[in-house]
UniProtKB/Swiss-Prot annotation:
Swiss-Prot/TrEMBL catalytic activity: a quinone + NADH + 5 H(+)(in) = a quinol + NAD(+) + 4 H(+)(out)
A single Gene Ontology CC term: plasma membrane
NCBIfam families according to UniProt: nuoB_fam (TIGR01957), PRK06411.1 (NF005012)
Family: Belongs to the complex I 20 kDa subunit family.
Cofactor: [4Fe-4S] cluster
Assembly description: NDH-1 is composed of 13 different subunits. Subunits NuoB, CD, E, F, and G constitute the peripheral sector of the complex.
Keyword terms of this UniProt record: 4Fe-4S, Cell membrane, Iron, Iron-sulfur, Membrane, Metal-binding, NAD, Quinone, Translocase, Transport, Ubiquinone
Protein name: NADH-quinone oxidoreductase subunit B
Protein's gene: nuoB
Pfam families per record: Oxidored_q6
Keyword Cell cycle found: no
Claim: Cell membrane is one of the keywords in the record: yes
E.C. no: 7.1.1.-
Species the sequence originates in: Buchnera aphidicola subsp. Baizongia pistaciae (strain Bp)
């Protein structure tokens, strides 16, 4: 996924959402190759350092919709110890949070509230969709439930399950950290390019299928 952020125009129609305009940009790594060795290496090291700090200090927004939220907060207990990943600091304000977990059923009445909370979060920000209800509406194929959070918010990681176990939430957090480590974001609003680059990752289903095929091939060969 490649896009750039543009300043929000308050006079825009509120029906257009999300307000950020997404424009395709090229992979910045190609431009690094064209630079000299010193500047290219310096830029790469600087981005890696910033991404390392971002992915190891992800503060979640204390927000839940249904039973999946119970499983999410269970990961904060001493049994699972999510502080190992630097995400034990729950924030009561979206302005102090780095990512939002949609844990539960997204009802139509909650959509404008969720969108407003998302708009109050500062960049960089990410969204995790946790559970079948948040991913696709789950068993609620009715008029009052939105069939997937990605209908009104950009989602970075999907966590399957009804409800997912705390281990699944931790695994989703690790996938988000992996995605952040490959991102290229502006170092400042006045330094460098303002484009955002996100690497494309295969689904875990494809990765596991590939691993199973490799194991099966090695067993057949032996």
């Amino acid at each position: 996924m490649k896009y750039t952020l543009t300043r929000v125009n308050i006079s825009d129609d509120d029906q257009n959402y999300p307000r950020e305009k997404k424009i395709q940009v090229s992979d910045p790594t190609k431009k690094y190759i064209q630079k000299n060795v010193f500047m290219g290496t310096l830029s790469k090291v600087l981005h890696n350092l910033v991404n390392w700090g971002r992915k190891n200090s992800l503060w979640p927004y204390n927000f839940g919709l249904s039973c999946c939220y119970v499983e999410m907060v269970t990961s904060f207990t001493s049994v699972h110890d999510i502080s190992r990943f630097g995400s034990e600091v729950l924030r009561a304000s979206p302005r102090q949070a780095d990512f939002m977990v949609i844990a539960g059923t997204p009802f139509i009445k909650m959509v404008p509230i969720i969108q407003r909370l998302y708009d109050q979060m500062l960049e960089p920000k990410w969204v995790i969709s946790m559970g079948s209800c948040a991913n696709s509406g789950g068993m609620y194929d009715i008029y009052s439930v939105v069939q997937g959070v990605d209908k009104f918010l950009p989602v970075d990681v999907y966590i399957p399950g009804c409800p997912p176990r705390p281990e699944a939430y931790i695994h989703g957090l690790m996938l988000l950290q992996k995605s952040i480590s490959k991102e290229r974001r502006p170092l400042s609003w006045i330094i460098g390019e303002q484009g955002i680059y996100k690497a494309n990752f295969n689904s875990e289903k494809k990765n596991l299928r590939k691993m199973r095929n490799l194991v099966k091939y090695s067993q057949d060969k032996n």
